[in-house]
Curated annotation (Swiss-Prot):
Changing N23Y: In strain: cv. Cvi-1; enhanced stability and better tolerance to photo-oxidative stress conditions. Zn(2+) binds at H125, H133, H142, D145. SUPFAM superfamilies: Cu,Zn superoxide dismutase-like (SSF49329). It comes from Arabidopsis thaliana. This is Superoxide dismutase [Cu-Zn] 2, chloroplastic.
Amino acid sequence: MAATNTILAFSSPSRLLIPPSSNPSTLRSSFRGVSLNNNNLHRLQSVSFAVKAPSKALTVVSAAKKAVAVLKGTSDVEGVVTLTQDDSGPTTVNVRITGLTPGPHGFHLHEFGDTTNGCISTGPHFNPNNMTHGAPEDECRHAGDLGNINANADGVAETTIVDNQIPLTGPNSVVGRAFVVHELKDDLGKGGHELSLTTGNAGGRLACGVIGLTPL
């Protein structure tokens, strides 16, 4: 008598019950079904099949960014500036610069991260909106206008700046641009000097550093 085949489809997990039989048989299976013939089924009382879905790794993506700039100059002025930003919020800038003369010094973000010719080659203030120079709180200002930092009697300036015009991501990202600390006080565009509306008449460039991303 020719063996007959039975095709049973199942979904996972499932249990296939096979009645006893006196005819020898082999068992063949695949993902979509099970093929049985009637030979030797008496050796199998039940077969359990379970298909386990592949587990997916949980990936947590952080939108936080962190960057740093190390400032160097031709004088003894040097410093470190760190930047952090969470999601699309404002950027927090922590500044520590040493070797300054006591008092206020203009502190700006410049357009280029090019220091091949010293701080001069960093270009003008970062100004994607084509505004005139102003104070950080002014509506009309360069994005790179960060005001003044004040050095103490030891020549050390430490401050924290929170600003929403210097993001670490997006089309106006400041990564790859440069911070510059200046010789003089920034007049914030209100000094009436011919340079007030471009540089704040903040004088020479003492030190600069290019912004680069760092691990969180």
